[in-house]
Amino acid sequence: MQLNIPTWLTLFRIALIPFFVLAFYLPFTWAPMVCAIIFIVAAATDWFDGFLARLWKQTTRFGAFLDPVADKIMVAAALVLVSEHYHTWWITLPAATMIAREIIISSLREWMAELGKRSSVAVSWMGKVKTTAQMAALIALLWRPNFEFELGGFILLYVATVMTFWSMFQYINAAWSDLREA
């Protein structure tokens, strides 16, 4: 297996996860900002690795596998941290919903791939919009420099939660005939 720059960016994103987790727990007033900045860099590599892979025609099966895995680990870690910080059901419930959706859709994609129908549950524009809202919410809720920023994060978290359900139902609907035959 040959590693190209887009795949190295994905590996770099995975390597950043422990650093934003550690930054979250630092006992300094600037720790939330550092945590959010590391998360921003990791989130930027999510966009940049795919862009470069397509631009340079360096898409690989390994990269196609690793990229969504890196995304899910990064987002799940951030959701757990945000849930721990706020320690309330109205943050934990959307976080648990998003993590559950990622597990369900990843499993659905794997199953559809075994049937040779992975393209029917390929990433949709709704999934991309959900991810954008999710990333923005997590940045705001990890950083939380002021009330307005935090409030925006809460609102985006709930927007992302609604989109989480919407996109999940889109994927399930796309696979429904195969699910009924199973």
From Swiss-Prot:
Superkingdom to which the source organism belongs: Bacteria
EC primary class: transferase
PROSITE patterns: CDP_ALCOHOL_P_TRANSF
Pathway: Phospholipid metabolism; phosphatidylglycerol biosynthesis; phosphatidylglycerol from CDP-diacylglycerol: step 1/2
Membrane spanning residue stretches: 13-37, 61-81, 87-107, 146-168
Positions on the Cytoplasmic side per record topology: 1-12, 82-86, 169-181
A single MF term (Gene Ontology): CDP-diacylglycerol-glycerol-3-phosphate 3-phosphatidyltransferase activity
A GO BP annotation: phosphatidylglycerol biosynthetic process
Enzyme Commission number: 2.7.8.5
Location in or out of the cell: Cell inner membrane
Periplasmic side, ranges: 38-60, 108-145
Pfam families membership: CDP-OH_P_transf (PF01066)
An annotated GO cellular component: plasma membrane
Catalytic activity: a CDP-1,2-diacyl-sn-glycerol + sn-glycerol 3-phosphate = a 1,2-diacyl-sn-glycero-3-phospho-(1'-sn-glycero-3'-phosphate) + CMP + H(+)
Mode of membrane association: Multi-pass membrane protein
InterPro entries xref list: CDP-alcohol_PTase-I, CDP-OH_P_trans, CDP-OH_PTrfase_TM_dom, CDP_ALCOHOL_P_TRANSF_CS, PGP_synthase_bac, Phosphatidylglycerol_P_synth
Keyword annotations: Cell inner membrane, Cell membrane, Lipid biosynthesis, Lipid metabolism, Membrane, Phospholipid biosynthesis, Phospholipid metabolism, Transferase, Transmembrane, Transmembrane helix
HAMAP family (alphabetical): PgsA
Record-stated family: Belongs to the CDP-alcohol phosphatidyltransferase class-I family.
Function: Catalyzes the conversion of cytidine diphosphate diacylglycerol (CDP-DG) and glycerol 3-phosphate into phosphatidylglycerol. Essential for the synthesis of anionic phospholipids, thereby playing a role in balancing the ratio of zwitterionic and anionic phospholipids, which is thought to be important for normal membrane function.
NCBIfam families in alphabetical order: pgsA (TIGR00560), PRK10832.1 (NF008090)
Name this polypeptide is given: CDP-diacylglycerol--glycerol-3-phosphate 3-phosphatidyltransferase
The species this protein was found in: Photorhabdus laumondii subsp. laumondii (strain DSM 15139 / CIP 105565 / TT01) (Photorhabdus luminescens subsp. laumondii)
Gene: pgsA
